[in-house]
Amino acid sequence: MLKPSVTSAPTADMATLTVVQPLTLDRDVARAIELLEKLQESGEVPVHKLQSLKKVLQSEFCTAIREVYQYMHETITVNGCPEFRARATAKATVAAFAASEGHSHPRVVELPKTDEGLGFNVMGGKEQNSPIYISRIIPGGVAERHGGLKRGDQLLSVNGVSVEGEHHEKAVELLKAAKDSVKLVVRYTPKVLEEMEARFEKLRTARRRQQQQLLIQQQQQQQQQQPQQNHMS
């Protein structure tokens, strides 16, 4: 007797797998601005309110939010429905901006990874009790030609991996491991970098003084030992 074929139901793990749909935030914002302009022509809504909203949508801050949200959406690792992913992305975006309170807002900078490197140096880290910063933009390098990175930018994440509170070597390893391109989330805090560099310079100065004092002590000991050796001979 022929048995009817049975199609097994998807497992719970299969049901939770979702395809991440690409965002269309740029297009959505452009469409919103277009609708605002049409409303302005109709005269149904006070012009000053429409202009204020349009100004917000076109602001650098709104652009930064859009870029960070899109970056979080692409890199965050969650399973579940699109609504759940959207909530997780929103929370991660809010957390990124909350962490930068009192400083410049976060930015997303993407650089191509070539044989010549990325064209910048980093300093700081957990072992130095400081954030990780872009300390130098190499003249003529990839970062300078791209123009999106600044000396004084604090490095928040590399290709979706947070480096806040991490050791210096962790950030260096992530940068070296990147292939084709690297996406950085940074925020501009030059005053903090200046304070950190000043602290490091004090430590270097103190270390040089200790080395000089040690050298002087060694020379004095040698001078004291020479007369004793001459007397014994």
UniProtKB/Swiss-Prot annotation:
Pfam families: L27, PDZ
Taxonomy, superkingdom: Eukaryota
Annotated SUPFAM superfamilies: L27 domain, PDZ domain-like
Record bears the keyword Cell membrane: yes
Localization of this protein: Cell membrane; Basolateral cell membrane; Cell junction; Postsynaptic density membrane
Domain PDZ, chain residue ranges per copy: 108-190
Gene3D superfamilies: 2.30.42.10, L27 domain
Matches recorded under InterPro entries: L27_C, L27_dom, L27_dom_sf, LIN7, MAM_complex_regulator, PDZ, PDZ_sf
Membrane topology listed for this record: Peripheral membrane protein
Keyword Disulfide bond: no
Region (Disordered): 214-233
GO cellular component assignments: basolateral plasma membrane; bicellular tight junction; membrane; postsynaptic density membrane; presynapse; transport vesicle membrane
Keywords: Cell junction, Cell membrane, Exocytosis, Membrane, Postsynaptic cell membrane, Protein transport, Synapse, Tight junction, Transport
Motif (Kinase interacting site): 14-28
Entry's Gene Ontology BP terms: exocytosis; inner ear development; neurotransmitter secretion; protein transport; synaptic vesicle transport
Organs and tissues of expression: Expressed in the kidney, along the length of the nephron.
Gene Ontology molecular function terms on file: L27 domain binding
Role of this protein: Plays a role in establishing and maintaining the asymmetric distribution of channels and receptors at the plasma membrane of polarized cells. Forms membrane-associated multiprotein complexes that may regulate delivery and recycling of proteins to the correct membrane domains. The tripartite complex composed of LIN7 (LIN7A, LIN7B or LIN7C), CASK and APBA1 associates with the motor protein KIF17 to transport vesicles containing N-methyl-D-aspartate (NMDA) receptor subunit NR2B along microtubules.
Family of the protein in this entry: Belongs to the lin-7 family.
Subunit structure of this chain's protein: Forms a complex with CASK and CASKIN1. Component of the brain-specific heterotrimeric complex (LIN-10-LIN-2-LIN-7 complex) composed of at least APBA1, CASK, and LIN7, which associates with the motor protein KIF17 to transport vesicles along microtubules. Can also interact with other modular proteins containing protein-protein interaction domains like PALS1, PALS2, MPP7, DLG1, DLG2 and DLG3 through its L27 domain. Interacts with DLG4, GRIN2B and MARCHF11 as well as CDH1 and CTNNB1, the channels KCNJ12/Kir2.2, KCNJ4/Kir2.3 and probably KCNJ2/Kir2.1 and SLC6A12/BGT-1 via its PDZ domain.
Name by which UniProt lists this protein: Protein lin-7 homolog A
Primary gene name: Lin7a
